[in-house]
């Protein structure tokens, strides 16, 4: 009888452990594990990126990246994106809210990536939005992007800090900041962002998830609704939405200039990707542009990413 009771207790324990394997409690908050891609976070209880964004969709979004005319054939791939994104899914990257919000954030982030790495033009096969991930670094840079006045992240002799990556990084101080963020020595080795696609995506996602200054939102925050504008923000016409992601990432290089080609190209990539992913551009969200927004960080104060 005692043996039978012990066996029953063992079976109950195994059953309870199995039920808890995917869901745990941390400080009274439900957290979940989804294997290697997402674990130990409440955001992991939602669908992960690979649940709703598959390799064939990545191929559709970046259909011409490996064409002979492209400048980084064979470099970018789906697995590199998923591997980099997985580092940030526990923080809510494309796991905040439901499936539609996750898909919209994938399209928004990759919309920036596609626009910033495109070699497309209006008459190109498939149109200008079909040529994202054509580059992994700036071609024929006109300068070395070395700011000798920066003592915290001084230029390394013989190293050039031209644009590299999925959302290109410029200038020595920015390579230093991003390198600290992803725990890579980019100040000494900025070339890593044009040699390793996973690191290139990781640097871009880190920028998406990280505020440029204290008490400011990240691009992720303004997109998913984590940010509540202050009175000063509303007076500056800054509101949550895709438009504010451009403000966070580029400031007055893109925003506050009315309707410009640079701004509209980024919006076009975002909406095109929404269509290809089956979400539809009608779900682009409010406050799509930043033409009237005052920059969070004017050029005189910005980090010049």
Language model: regions and residue ranges:
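Cleavable N-terminal signal peptides of Sec/SRP-targeted secreted and luminal proteins
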Residues: 2-21
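A positional/structural detector of protein chain ends, strongest at the extreme C-terminus
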Residues: 1-3, 304-305
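Folded extracytoplasmic luminal domains of secretory or organellar precursors
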Residues: 21-305
């Amino acid at each position: 009888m005692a043996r039978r009771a012990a066996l029953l207790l063992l079976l109950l324990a195994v059953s309870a452990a199995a039920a808890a394997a995917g869901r745990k409690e941390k400080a009274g908050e439900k957290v979940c594990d989804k294997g290697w891609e997402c674990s130990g976070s409440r955001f992991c209880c939602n669908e992960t990126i690979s649940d709703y964004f598959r390799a064939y969709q990545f191929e559709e979004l970046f259909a011409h990246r490996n064409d002979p005319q492209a400048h980084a054939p064979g470099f970018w791939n789906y697995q590199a994106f998923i591997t980099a994104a997985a580092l940030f899914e526990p923080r809510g990257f494309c796991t905040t809210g439901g499936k539609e919000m996750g898909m919209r954030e994938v399209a928004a982030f990759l919309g920036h990536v596609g626009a910033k790495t495109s070699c497309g033009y209006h008459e190109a096969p498939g149109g200008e939005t079909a040529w994202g991930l054509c580059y992994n670094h700036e071609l024929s840079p006109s300068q070395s992007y070395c700011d000798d006045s920066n003592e915290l992240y001084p230029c390394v002799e013989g190293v050039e800090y031209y644009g590299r990556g999925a959302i290109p990084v410029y200038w020595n101080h920015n390579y230093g900041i991003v390198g600290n963020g992803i725990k890579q020595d980019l100040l000494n080795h900025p070339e890593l962002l044009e040699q390793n696609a996973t690191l290139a995506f990781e640097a871009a996602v880190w920028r998406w998830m990280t505020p440029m200054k204290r008490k400011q939102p990240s691009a992720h925050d303004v997109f998913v609704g984590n940010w509540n504008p202050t009175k000063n923000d509303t007076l500056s016409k800054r509101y949550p939405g895709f438009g504010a992601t451009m403000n966070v990432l580029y400031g007055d290089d893109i925003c506050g200039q009315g309707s410009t080609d640079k701004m509209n190209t980024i919006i076009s990539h975002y909406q095109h990707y929404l269509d290809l992913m089956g979400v539809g551009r009608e779900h682009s969200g409010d406050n799509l542009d930043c033409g009237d927004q005052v920059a969070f960080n004017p050029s005189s104060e910005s980090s010049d990413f």
